[in-house]
Amino acid sequence: MARVTVEDCLDHVDNRFELVLVASKRARQLARQGMEPTVEWDNDKPTVVALREIAVGHVTKEILKQREQDYQTSSLDLALSTNSLNLEGFSF
């Protein structure tokens, strides 16, 4: 599929607003969580791949029920590890 149209995606999602939610969640999964795409990547950005997956029916609104990975935990771990540095003499 060379181009993805909104109409192609709306065959599988109820409305444009839900399409935005589904596509953004799937794009985040592809970009940040390392999920494997169900269509060929073709050097596209994650948002384009997400829309292509929706257009062919591989991704549906059921994705909205999935829980996202907690990135705050990893940020907290990072903050705790930097806290172990010697910061004497600095005021916070």
Curated annotation (Swiss-Prot):
Catalysed reaction equations from the record: RNA(n) + a ribonucleoside 5'-triphosphate = RNA(n+1) + diphosphate
Top-level class of the enzyme under EC nomenclature: transferase
Domain of life from the UniProt record: Bacteria
Disulfide bond sites: none
Gene Ontology cellular component annotations, sorted alphabetically: DNA-directed RNA polymerase complex
Pfam families: RNA_pol_Rpb6
GO MF term set: DNA binding; DNA-directed RNA polymerase activity
SUPFAM superfamilies: RPB6/omega subunit-like
Keywords linked to the UniProt accession: DNA-directed RNA polymerase, Nucleotidyltransferase, Transcription, Transferase
EC number(s) stated in the UniProt entry for this protein: 2.7.7.6
Membrane-spanning segments: none
GO BP terms: DNA-templated transcription
UniProt family annotation: Belongs to the RNA polymerase subunit omega family.
NCBIfam families: rpoZ
Record text on subunit structure and interactions: The RNAP catalytic core consists of 2 alpha, 1 beta, 1 beta' and 1 omega subunit. When a sigma factor is associated with the core the holoenzyme is formed, which can initiate transcription.
HAMAP family: RNApol_bact_RpoZ
General function of this protein: Promotes RNA polymerase assembly. Latches the N- and C-terminal regions of the beta' subunit thereby facilitating its interaction with the beta and alpha subunits.
Protein name (Swiss-Prot/TrEMBL): DNA-directed RNA polymerase subunit omega
Gene field: rpoZ
